[in-house]
């Protein structure tokens, strides 16, 4: 019982941290320390939870002692536990990086509160067993993201916030409509219970279920930045400071991917012929359009932003396969991309601190004065491209294996070719930004640059360690994958598991 209550504690600690931050006024230094302390405590709880899940299996919490499917359920399985640990590590890195890059004017107000509360929404989305509460937690982290996007009040931020707000209002509306239709069919909001009931109703309510599927895919693909709903992403992610871009790019899109994977495996497992072809089609177009964007620009921000799309597409190819290799690959690649995108956005943030520009046309020759920064970026670039034995390799290997097992050879080839596009785009930054004649900046060894560089190096080291630990983590990831290609495991954990 104590172990199960720790699941809720991973939500309670950041909530109380956010409440404390409200009462600190404009004392930005105190806010930094309180935020980092709260995040470290949350990480400790999350690591304990991950260990407990690995040893004892999924942990279930029934709020108010109301049993499933009647009460509010939180379920922590291997995948959600890994995602939560990764998310907290990233949040700690971004908070530390923000102290020298976000600007004191932002930190004085609701910057740290918004980061902490956004983490609450993300953790809640990863653990809820209720489809309506998934909507609630989506709204929690979206409201925080609105604040983070607009803080600073620059013209581009205000313009992109309006677009971002409109997109999310529309998708949230369709989310509620989808939940309402689903509830009218099955009479329950518990995701495991919905899955059980749909297994007997899919033949009699096929038309309505197709509408629900389309609505869910529209909502979650928009959140994930998948084709064709990605149009908001390049502009909205370009506007805020680098720390916030890293936060959004690493975490927000992955919540959308998680929601697709969870609902597809539970609600539409019996309609794979339609649903998985739809997701595969969107995934491949996401890779293609992301690849075009990644090689079309000389702007460091835009190159990495479009690489987010490529990664989302690759993950969704694995999800669409819905077999063991595909899901294992999707899980590996999701965690890899969360870590490596954080590292890359922080690294180009350091480059911006030095050069005051994101355009590769405005600077070059950074390797002469910043060799550590340059070679750290090179390692992160190789990891992003999936060069073995770095972290990007393992996820793509399993995803390509899954496509060939299912006979989707063209899909596998597109995933492989995307690695070349990714490698070209990031090596383009490396060669043009770090080599050539130094121009457009005055070399500086300021404390701020050194601090930001150190945090970026730590992020890359964590990414490398994840890649080198792939074999060690395989049993945990394999266990996490089982509940998706065999949804009866998740259903049993919720409706018949221990509490």
UniProtKB/Swiss-Prot annotation:
Compartments, record wording: Cell membrane
Broad class of the protein's primary localization: membrane
One GO CC term on file: plasma membrane
Family the entry assigns: Belongs to the CPA3 antiporters (TC 2.A.63) subunit D family.
One GO BP annotation of this record: sodium ion transport
Matching NCBIfam families: PRK07691.1
GO molecular function: antiporter activity; NADH dehydrogenase (ubiquinone) activity
Membrane topology: Multi-pass membrane protein
Subunit structure: May form a heterooligomeric complex that consists of seven subunits: mnhA1, mnhB1, mnhC1, mnhD1, mnhE1, mnhF1 and mnhG1.
Pfam families, per database record: Proton_antipo_M (PF00361)
Transmembrane region(s): 5-25, 33-53, 72-92, 109-129, 131-151, 169-189, 207-227, 241-261, 277-297, 303-323, 327-347, 373-393, 410-430, 457-477
Keyword Manganese: no
Keywords for the protein's UniProt record, in alphabetical order: Antiport, Cell membrane, Hydrogen ion transport, Ion transport, Membrane, Sodium, Sodium transport, Transmembrane, Transmembrane helix, Transport
InterPro entries, A to Z: CPA3_Na-H_Antiporter_D, NADH_UbQ_OxRdtase, ND/Mrp_TM
Function statement: Mnh complex is a Na(+)/H(+) antiporter involved in Na(+) excretion.
Listed name of the protein: Na+/H+-antiporter, MnhD subunit
Organism domain of life: Bacteria
């Amino acid at each position: 019982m104590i172990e199960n209550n720790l699941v809720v504690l991973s939500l309670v600690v950041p909530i109380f941290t956010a409440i404390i931050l409200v009462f600190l006024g404009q004392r930005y230094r105190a806010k930094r320390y309180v935020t980092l302390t709260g995040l470290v405590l949350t990480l400790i709880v999350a690591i304990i939870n991950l260990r407990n899940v690995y040893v004892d299996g999924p942990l279930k919490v029934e709020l108010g002692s109301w049993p499933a499917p009647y009460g509010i359920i939180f379920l922590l399985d291997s995948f959600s536990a890994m995602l939560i640990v990764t998310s907290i590590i990233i949040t700690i890195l971004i908070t530390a990086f923000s102290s020298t890059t976000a600007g004191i004017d932002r930190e004085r107000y609701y910057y740290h509160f918004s980061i902490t509360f956004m983490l609450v929404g993300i953790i809640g989305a990863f653990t809820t067993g209720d489809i309506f509460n998934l909507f609630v937690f989506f709204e929690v982290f979206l409201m925080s993201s609105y604040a983070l996007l607009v803080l600073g009040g620059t013209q581009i931020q205000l313009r992109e916030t309006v677009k971002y707000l409109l997109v999310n209002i529309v998708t949230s509306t369709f989310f509620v409509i989808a939940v309402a239709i689903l509830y009218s069919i099955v009479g329950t909001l518990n995701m495991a219970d919905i899955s059980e009931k749909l297994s007997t109703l899919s033949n009699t309510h096929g038309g309505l279920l197709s509408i629900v599927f389309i609505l869910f895919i529209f909502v979650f693909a928009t959140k994930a930045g998948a084709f064709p709903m990605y149009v908001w992403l390049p502009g909205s992610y370009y506007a805020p400071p680098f720390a916030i871009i890293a936060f959004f790019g690493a975490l927000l899109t992955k919540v959308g991917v998680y929601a697709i994977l969870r609902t597809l495996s539970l609600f539409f497992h019996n309609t794979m012929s339609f649903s998985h072809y739809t997701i595969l089609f969107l995934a491949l177009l996401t890779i293609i359009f992301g690849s075009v964007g990644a090689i079309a620009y000389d702007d460091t921000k835009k190159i990495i932003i479009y690489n987010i799309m490529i990664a989302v597409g690759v993950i969704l190819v694995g999800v669409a396969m819905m077999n063991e290799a595909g899901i294992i690959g999707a899980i590996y690649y999701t965690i890899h991309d969360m870590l490596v995108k954080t590292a890359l956005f922080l690294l180009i943030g350091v480059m911006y601190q030095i050069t005051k520009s994101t355009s590769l046309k405005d600077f070059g020759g950074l390797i002469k004065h910043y060799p550590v920064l340059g070679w750290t970026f090179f390692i992160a670039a190789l990891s992003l491209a999936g060069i073995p034995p770095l972290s990007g390799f393992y996820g793509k290997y399993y995803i390509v294996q899954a496509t060939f097992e299912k006979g989707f050879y063209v899909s596998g080839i597109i995933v492989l070719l995307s690695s070349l596009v990714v490698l070209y785009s990031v090596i383009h930054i490396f060669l043009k930004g770090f080599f050539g004649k130094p121009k457009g900046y005055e070399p500086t060894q300021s404390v701020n640059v050194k601090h930001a560089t150190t945090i970026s190096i730590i992020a890359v080291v964590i990414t490398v360690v994840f890649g080198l630990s792939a074999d060690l983590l395989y049993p945990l990831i394999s266990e996490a994958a089982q509940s998706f290609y065999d949804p009866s495991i998740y259903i049993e954990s919720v409706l018949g598991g221990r509490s």
